[in-house]
Curated annotation (Swiss-Prot):
Role noted for this protein: NDH-1 shuttles electrons from NADH, via FMN and iron-sulfur (Fe-S) centers, to quinones in the respiratory chain. The immediate electron acceptor for the enzyme in this species is believed to be ubiquinone. Couples the redox reaction to proton translocation (for every two electrons transferred, four hydrogen ions are translocated across the cytoplasmic membrane), and thus conserves the redox energy in a proton gradient.
EC number: 7.1.1.-
Pfam families hit by this protein: Proton_antipo_M
Protein name as catalogued: NADH-quinone oxidoreductase subunit N
Topological type in the membrane: Multi-pass membrane protein
Reactions catalysed: a quinone + NADH + 5 H(+)(in) = a quinol + NAD(+) + 4 H(+)(out)
Record key words, sorted: Cell inner membrane, Cell membrane, Membrane, NAD, Quinone, Translocase, Transmembrane, Transmembrane helix, Transport, Ubiquinone
Segments traversing the membrane: 5-25, 34-54, 72-92, 99-119, 120-140, 154-174, 196-216, 230-250, 259-279, 286-303, 314-334, 356-376, 393-413, 432-452
Molecular functions per Gene Ontology: NADH dehydrogenase (ubiquinone) activity; NADH:ubiquinone reductase (non-electrogenic) activity; quinone binding
One GO BP annotation of this record: ATP synthesis coupled electron transport
UniProt keyword Translocase present: yes
Length: 463
């Protein structure tokens, strides 16, 4: 038991130790480069531990069965720390201080707790630890007048999500007598008004955190008012953790037809609303916000599948989406800095061809253009949904995806138009070498996903 508590949660212990050391460095006013180096090293150490656990097939149920370490937990946490490392390298060029690294590390800790959860108590704690630092990150070192407004809107709507989840959990406890996730899924399968109400409230809270339509209201303002690395964090790691938390709750449970219908409807609305609204955006962050809403729809779309293959499809989709989003933000930083006006991309290929090509690959991957990993991610999701007999829904999702290609291709065409006048940009005062590092790391990760599309199937099945 003690060994499992130490080894099974060693990545979390590393992150907790990192947070404490970073706090000490902040108090002692130590050079911020020490904190950034420690952050990257700690995440690499955590990733190494997770790889070892996967190689040995390590599993454990600890803390009175509130925490479960299994392959899903290990893969999910590896995705989170890997994305955190890429984001960390990208953020080095933004001259982030110890406070920034403390907040990011705290959110990563919350994300990992979510993926470890076998009970709703630890799951709820993880969600709150994930979300709370985000409010501060949005206003940290941010001179925008809209930063506070976006942060407050995110805080208020996140509080609503928290209240919904808590009320749902009270109904779960009244129905099952405990807060174990497996007991909840078993109770939901039996039906009943109380179990239905609990499911609606818990799922609504998660949908709000994941910015699924119509619970998306906070995302455009929050994303557009934050600095670009923070926007990348909110759009990638936070969303990935929440979606994987939903998978943790549902597991391989067979959903009843009514639940499948509701999830399918919300996923369709998210896809169409996000893709159609993104077409009219002239700012990169706003476009990314509506893109993330549509991608949340694709992720929810995978939950329609009742064959059990949705877990592997969602792991691949979440990993590809998160890495692509961070890489796209890093490339945009190289091209335009903190000014997110898409007009800055006009004809930029002539000045910065490599960054323009990398951003184009990321954008086309988000659009689902073959043979990029974004296409493979959508292919796996569509395959699982069609296999479960939902052909009509899959056709509608394909139409939504087709609509989404318009605004993605618009970004690419801006960069490669020979007749466009390049907008003069102010000189960037910070060194972009680390931003390049984050962009290249993300590109390498995407290349790995493209070359090894079955990587999560192999790991989940222990091949």
């Amino acid at each position: 038991m003690a060994t499992d508590l130490l080894y099974g949660l060693l990545p979390e212990h590393i992150l907790l130790g990192l947070i404490l050391v970073l706090m000490l460095l902040e108090i002692l006013s130590v050079d911020k480069r020490a904190g950034s180096a420690l952050f990257i090293a700690s995440l690499l150490a955590g990733a190494g531990v997770l790889v070892m656990q996967l190689q040995t097939g390590y599993t454990a149920d600890i803390v009175m069965n509130e925490i479960r370490i299994d392959r899903f937990s290990e893969i999910g946490r590896l995705i989170i720390v890997s994305c955190g490392a890429i984001l960390g390298v990208y953020s080095l060029s933004s001259e982030a201080g110890h406070k920034y690294w403390i907040l990011i590390a705290s959110s990563l800790l919350g994300a990992m707790i979510i993926l470890d959860s076998a009970g709703f108590i630890s799951l709820f704690m993880g969600i709150e630890i994930l979300s709370l630092p985000g409010f501060a990150l949005m206003v940290l070192n941010n001179g925008k007048s809209t930063a506070s407004e976006g942060s407050i809107k995110y805080l208020l709507l996140s509080s609503v999500a928290t209240a919904l989840v808590l009320f749902g959990l009270s109904l779960v406890y009244g129905s099952t007598g405990n807060l174990n996730i497996s007991s909840f899924t078993a109770a939901v399968a039996t039906g009943g008004v109380q179990n239905l109400a609990a499911s609606v409230m818990i799922l609504s809270g998660f949908f709000l955190k994941a910015s699924v339509f119509p619970f998306h209201g906070w995302a455009p303002d929050a994303y557009s008012s934050a600095r670009l690395p923070v926007t990348a964090f909110l759009a990638s790691i936070v969303k990935a953790a929440v979606v994987l938390g939903l998978v943790r709750i549902l597991g391989n449970a067979v959903l009843n037809p009514e639940a499948v219908t509701v999830i399918a409807l919300l996923s369709m609305l998210s896809m169409f609303y996000g893709n159609i609204t993104a077409i009219h955006q002239t700012a990169f962050k706003k476009m990314l916000a509506y893109s993330s809403i549509s991608h949340a729809g694709y992720m929810m779309f995978a939950l329609v599948d009742n064959t059990g293959a949705r877990t592997e499809a969602l792991l691949y989709y979440v990993a590809v989406y998160a890495v692509t989003t961070i890489t796209a933000c890093a490339c945009f930083s190289i091209l335009s800095g903190e000014d997110d006006n898409l007009d800055n991309l006009n004809g930029i290929f002539r000045k910065k061809p490599v960054a323009a090509i990398l951003l184009s690959l990321c954008v086309l991957s988000l659009a689902g253009i073959p043979p990029l990993p974004g296409f493979l991610a959508k292919f796996f999701v569509f395959k699982t949904v069609i296999a479960s007999g939902h052909l009509t829904v899959a056709v509608l999702a394909f139409v939504a995806s087709y609509i989404g290609t318009f605004f993605y291709l618009g970004v690419v065409l801006r960069m490669f138009r020979s007749d466009a006048e390049t907008v003069e940009q102010p000189a960037n005062a910070t060194c972009l070498c680390w931003t390049w590092g984050g962009a290249l790391l993300g590109t390498l990760a995407l290349a790995l996903f493209m070359l090894l599309p079955n990587i999560f199937h192999w790991v989940m099945t222990g091949i």
